[in-house]
Amino acid sequence: MKFIDEAKITVLAGKGGDGSASFRREKYIPKGGPDGGDGGRGGSVYAVADRNVNTLVEFRYTRIFKAQKGENGRGAQCYGKAGDDLTIRVPVGTVFSDVNSGEVVADLAEDGETVCLAKGGKGGLGNIHFKSSTNRAPRQHTLGEPGEEWELALELKVLADVGLLGMPNAGKSTFIRAVSAARPKVADYPFTTLAPNLGVVRVDSERSFVIADIPGLIEGAAEGAGLGHQFLRHLQRTRLLLHLVDISPRWEAGDPVHEARAIVEELRKYDQALYEKPRWLVLNKLDMVDEGEREAVVAKFVEDYGWNGPVFAISALDGSGCSALTYAVMDYLGMLAPRHEAEDPAPPAS
């Protein structure tokens, strides 16, 4: 299935039913009083977050969602039936925004969370409500109110505790395969990953966290180079970023320090809050460095990069260093307050 993380839809709530203007007419009661019932309310449009829904692809093909209108009132004080509500199911992490104003309408971050997107119109009043001492046979009644109508933009931001950041071919997909059951495509060419991948990293029988791999960034992504920064939104909900850097000795045509800085600069251009998120440095492909030179290579990179935050040297291919990294991540996440209790703390020095 193609991964779709943006869509636009129109939601139309149902119109309320009209009130009835009728009079009681029975045998031996030729001039009975008013007995017109009220119209039923229109159906509303709701959205519910469903963990079994993974993308917004359905909304690329069905763009208009309309709830049922309320039935009109009838004589004998019969009230119209309310219109059926319409519920649409979206992935957990879907954000709804008003297309015209840009205002966020709802952010469904929990499974089962529900929001009313468009409220149904009220039903009209029947003429029974307008009877008075001076008007014994009112013909007045009211029409049902129209339901709300909105044009909404949907944006999916995947929910993960940890996000992977890095250049294409930095080994992010290999890493997520090494530490979780996720099986993203891995190949020796750039942009193998074309959509976000999620993996659950279980460090023991009781503790686990979710990690997200997004397509790699390159310098100029903010201006649309490569795949652009269209997938960076999926890192906004994470609590920690792992910046993977390829330190294998294949840099005749490039400088890993420059490229690492370029990635962080793209992050800053996209979103200052994302740039300030806690970030750890992960130096990957250690298996391609001579064993006797590894410590010196790591130390030189850290010095040249000017990094004084947490740093881990790993090989995603053979798994060395991965266990220590995942345990450190789990311990760090365990020290943070749950998502619903506190915001992320200040990032470590970088």
From Swiss-Prot:
The cross-references to SUPFAM superfamilies, in alphabetical order and at most eight, read: Obg GTP-binding protein N-terminal domain (SSF82051), P-loop containing nucleoside triphosphate hydrolases (SSF52540)
Keywords attached to this Swiss-Prot or TrEMBL record, sorted alphabetically, are: Cytoplasm, GTP-binding, Hydrolase, Magnesium, Metal-binding, Nucleotide-binding
Residues reported to bind GTP: 166-173, 191-195, 213-216, 284-287, 315-317
Instruction: Give the OBG-type G domain ranges.
Output: 160-334
InterPro entries in alphabetical order: G_OBG, GTP-bd, GTP-bd_Obg/CgtA, GTP1-OBG_CS, GTP1_OBG_dom, GTP1_OBG_dom_sf, OBG_GTPase, P-loop_NTPase
Q: Where does Mg(2+) bind?
A: S173, T193
Region annotation (Disordered) ranges = 17-43
Q: What is its EC number?
A: 3.6.5.-
Q: Which Gene3D superfamilies match?
A: GTP1/OBG domain, P-loop containing nucleotide triphosphate hydrolases
Give the top-level enzyme category: hydrolase
> Where is the protein localized?
Cytoplasm
Gene Ontology MF annotations: GTP binding; GTPase activity; magnesium ion binding
Q: Which residues form the Obg domain?
A: 1-159
Q: Which Pfam families match?
A: GTP1_OBG, MMR_HSR1
Q: Please, one GO biological process term? A: ribosome biogenesis
**Cofactor dependency:** Mg(2+)
Q: What does this protein do?
A: An essential GTPase which binds GTP, GDP and possibly (p)ppGpp with moderate affinity, with high nucleotide exchange rates and a fairly low GTP hydrolysis rate. Plays a role in control of the cell cycle, stress response, ribosome biogenesis and in those bacteria that undergo differentiation, in morphogenesis control.
Question: Tell me, how does this one assemble?
Answer: Monomer.
Family membership noted in the UniProt record: Belongs to the TRAFAC class OBG-HflX-like GTPase superfamily. OBG GTPase family.
- Recorded protein name is GTPase Obg
- Gene (UniProt): obg
